Amino acid sequence: MLILGSGSARRKELLESASIDFLLVPSDYNESQVAFEGDTLKYVETIAENKAKALLHKYPLDVILTADTVVEVDGEILGKPKDIEDAQKMLQLLNDKTHHVYTGVCIVSKDKKEVFVESASVTFNKLSTLDIESYIQTKEPMDKAGAYAIQGIGAKLIKQYDGDFHTIMGLPLKLVLEKLKDFNIVPKLK
């Protein structure tokens, strides 16, 4: 059985859209235990892997899938905003700039482990203070890395993106499905 170790509604929706059977069990791993030391890829890999390790001992016979997504702009890492003020700061940082989104993924069983990172770049439109405030009022940015959802209302903030759309959403679905085959997890036929 596949265990999705995530509280992310987006990751859940993506796996469901691929007709994968899974059990949703958010990992209780505290991400703040990992300090950012300048290497974004290593950072998201480590968090994804630690989330998986926290679940593997509870589900030793299953396959665990975990992920972590961050936004990097001007050398700064942006996770989920802590509050409205934090969301405003993040959106202002992203305003009229190109940034990078990194999603680290860990798929692990008792016999095997795959850890990888996918990235994409996103360019924001030039936003007014009112644009930012209006978007924050929707509440959409509050549980998203970088304080926006490319697949939601936040699409209006985006000028362009380069890379995999699902990576920006938080789970590089095509690559995850390929890797899951190695763990004998395949989509069910409808």
Curated annotation (Swiss-Prot):
Reaction(s) catalysed by this chain's protein: dTTP + H2O = dTMP + diphosphate + H(+); UTP + H2O = UMP + diphosphate + H(+)
Superkingdom classification of source: Bacteria
Site annotation Important for substrate specificity: residues: R10, T69, Q151
Keywords attached to this entry: Cytoplasm, Hydrolase, Nucleotide metabolism
Protein localization: Cytoplasm
Assigned protein family: Belongs to the Maf family. YhdE subfamily.
Protein name from the UniProt record: dTTP/UTP pyrophosphatase
Native source organism of the sequence: Acholeplasma laidlawii (strain PG-8A)
